Amino acid sequence: MTRVVLAAAYRTPIGVFGGAFKDVPAYDLGATLIEHIIKETGLNPSEINEVIIGNVLQAGQGQNPARIAAMKGGLPETVPVFTVNKVCGSGLKSIQLAYQSIVTGENDIVLAGGMENMSQSPMLVNNSRFGFKMGHQSMVDSMVYDGLTDVFNQYHMGITAENLVEQYGISREEQDTFAVNSQKKAANAQQNGGFDSEIVPVSIPQRKGEPIVVTKDEGVRENVSVEKLSRLRPAFKKDGTVTAGNASGINDGAAMMLVMSEDKAKELNIEPLAVLDGFGSHGVDPSIMGIAPVGAVEKALKRSKKELSDIDVFELNEAFAAQSLAVDRELKLPPEKVNVKGGAIALGHPIGASGARVLVTLLHQLNDEVETGLTSLCIGGGQAIAAVVSKYK
């Protein structure tokens, strides 16, 4: 079977809600990375066979936001492009679709990833198309409803985390401790240049003066403590334990990479970072969607012909501390190998981009001692996706 490799994997800094990227559309964040990847590899843009980009909150952006990103990023109009929505798994699903298209011989080079600007998601007035006869009307927050609400139970993703708290007996202190550790690991990595190789700075033009250049993730908090987090009120249930401090943020960002056949990479003298070994997807009861990575990880390992003990590093999306703790318990993961640079609780969770973001961060950790990695994300609606990669040799 054709070996599929990953190269030129990058991400933008991750912006906080209403932060530096509040006026930068998702497709502009994506375009920044596309332009950088083309320039860095020296690849002729016309040689890219297809572009596949995850994006969840698409309302108001225009037709096919991935196409907008590709064209603004310098790709010719002849390159076909489509947008993927698998909620939090969108970015990684895009890479899986690229992988599948190469294995089947349809493509040799695909640019894949994800992008999201949650700050720009619009408010909607449903049923207003033909006017209202009388009475009050309300707006729907497209970010909350299309991105963060379980439609089957009509409640916020945070309640699915509270459901896992009850099922697994996870304490508030455990969650807050997990969140603090994520922040500390991310702060340490940020201070010591641990993200420098994966981040492409984003230049934001200003009406007056020089552009603002964003180079670092905005959500990392160096001085957080369990004591400080313990003062936060529950966010989703009156007597709950999930808070804004032990959950991932609402964020803006993008992540992209080249997915190629090994033969094409050799032909073009592009040095791969890793080989894609296999993927796994899984579904569970939507009310406990956060536990779905367990099944996805097991399937990805089986398809990759690997055991959990073969994995040197894990990048698992931290939707909620409770969700992460439940998955860690089920899989019995070694904590020293999981999210060694922190996770989404610290870095942020731009939902359409996160699947690609966790893989980008993983790829930049591979070396002679860390040769095999696994990444996974839970997905709203009761799903998960996972991937296994190995350092290219």
Swiss-Prot record:
Record-linked Pfam families: Thiolase_C, Thiolase_N
Active-site residues (renumbered): C88 (acyl-thioester intermediate), H349 (proton acceptor), C378 (proton acceptor)
Entries under PROSITE patterns matching the protein: THIOLASE_1, THIOLASE_2, THIOLASE_3
Compartment(s) of residence: Cytoplasm
Reaction(s) catalysed (UniProt annotation): 2 acetyl-CoA = acetoacetyl-CoA + CoA
InterPro entries: Thiolase, Thiolase-like, Thiolase_acyl_enz_int_AS, Thiolase_AS, Thiolase_C, Thiolase_CS, Thiolase_N
Chief subcellular location: cytoplasm
Transmembrane segments: none
Gene Ontology MF: a single term: acetyl-CoA C-acetyltransferase activity
Record keywords, A-Z: Acyltransferase, Cytoplasm, Transferase
Protein family: Belongs to the thiolase-like superfamily. Thiolase family.
Name this polypeptide is given: Probable acetyl-CoA acyltransferase
